[in-house]
Structures are given as structure tokens and as C-alpha cells.
């Protein structure tokens, strides 16, 4: 997990994806995109999209080494995502056009800010 290491002076550049809640630096989102959501968010190389779909305001950090076997990953709805560092709560709202794209692609968006719960 050394690829997720953030130097002490770099924490202020951390952002969390509003869809999957992975936490990375702004530069990593810019250079690599979101490892879970890039197919539909298109963050790589797009500062406007990064600003719209990630947030600097998040709470709690958990590290998931094996998302398929972790009960914490299941509890946080992270099973199926890549291993990494995730926020437990991400503040902010996705733009309407991004939400529409998710719906059109058949992806159920559940806000990570605690404002909605998963429908059973």
C-alpha cells in the first residue's frame, strides 16, 4: 500500500471521491483518475471534473487491504472496489449532469455524506 502513502506536508491536498469515497491527492486524481469510477467520472486530466466530483471535506479514514473479504468494506459498501484508503463520510453533492450519467449507465448513486440510506 506504499502507493497510497501521503507525505506529512501533503495532507491538505487530499480529496475524496463523492461516488466511491477513495481518498487520494488532487495530483493523483489528475494524473490517474479514480481507480473505481474513472469509466464514468472521467477525472483524469480534468480539473473541473475533479473539483465537481471530489471533496476536500470528509470524515474518518479507513484502509482496506482486501475489499472482498473485509467486513468493514461491506459495511461501508466498498466491497468490489480496489484496495486503498477510503473516507467513511464525504461531504458534497454530485452535479446533476453526473447523476444523470450514472442513472443512464444503470449505476445506483448513494451519497456518501449520510443524507440518504441504501434502499432495500
UniProtKB/Swiss-Prot annotation:
Going by the UniProt record, its keywords in alphabetical order are: Centromere, Chromosome, Metal-binding, mRNA processing, Nucleus, Transcription, Zinc, Zinc-finger
Q: What does the UniProt record say this protein does?
A: The spt4-spt5 complex mediates both activation and inhibition of transcription elongation, and plays a role in pre-mRNA processing. This complex seems to be important for the stability of the RNA polymerase II elongation machinery on the chromatin template but not for the inherent ability of this machinery to translocate down the gene.
List the GO cellular component terms.
chromosome, centromeric region; DSIF complex
Per the UniProt record, one Pfam family is Spt4
- Quaternary data: Component of the spt4-spt5 complex. Interacts with RNA polymerase II.
The Swiss-Prot or TrEMBL record describes its family as follows:
Belongs to the SPT4 family.
Where is this protein localized, as stated in its record?
Nucleus; Chromosome, Centromere
Q: Which GO terms describe its molecular function?
A: RNA polymerase II complex binding; zinc ion binding
Family annotation (SUPFAM superfamilies):
RNA polymerase subunits (SSF63393)
**Where are the C4-type-classified zinc fingers?**
17-37
Principal cellular location given in the protein's record? nucleus
Name-wise, this protein is Transcription elongation factor spt4
Q: Which InterPro entries match?
A: RPABC4/Spt4, Spt4, Spt4/RpoE2_Znf, Spt4_sf
Q: Give the GO biological process terms.
A: mRNA processing; regulation of DNA-templated transcription; transcription elongation by RNA polymerase II; transcription elongation-coupled chromatin remodeling
Species the sequence originates in: Neurospora crassa (strain ATCC 24698 / 74-OR23-1A / CBS 708.71 / DSM 1257 / FGSC 987)
Amino acid at each position: 500500500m506504499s502507493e497510497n502513502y501521503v507525505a506529512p506536508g501533503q495532507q491538505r491536498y487530499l480529496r475524496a471521491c463523492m461516488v466511491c469515497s477513495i481518498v487520494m491527492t488532487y495530483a493523483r486524481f489528475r494524473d490517474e483518475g479514480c481507480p473505481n469510477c474513472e469509466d464514468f467520472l472521467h477525472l483524469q486530466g480534468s480539473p473541473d471534473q475533479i473539483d465537481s466530483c471530489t471533496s476536500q471535506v470528509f470524515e474518518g479514514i479507513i484502509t482496506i487491504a482486501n475489499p472482498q473479504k473485509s467486513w468493514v468494506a461491506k459495511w461501508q459498501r466498498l466491497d468490489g472496489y480496489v484496495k486503498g484508503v477510503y473516507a467513511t463520510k464525504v461531504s458534497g453533492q454530485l452535479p446533476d449532469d453526473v447523476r444523470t450519467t450514472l442513472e443512464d449507465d444503470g449505476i445506483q448513486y448513494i451519497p456518501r455524506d449520510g443524507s440518504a440510506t441504501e434502499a432495500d
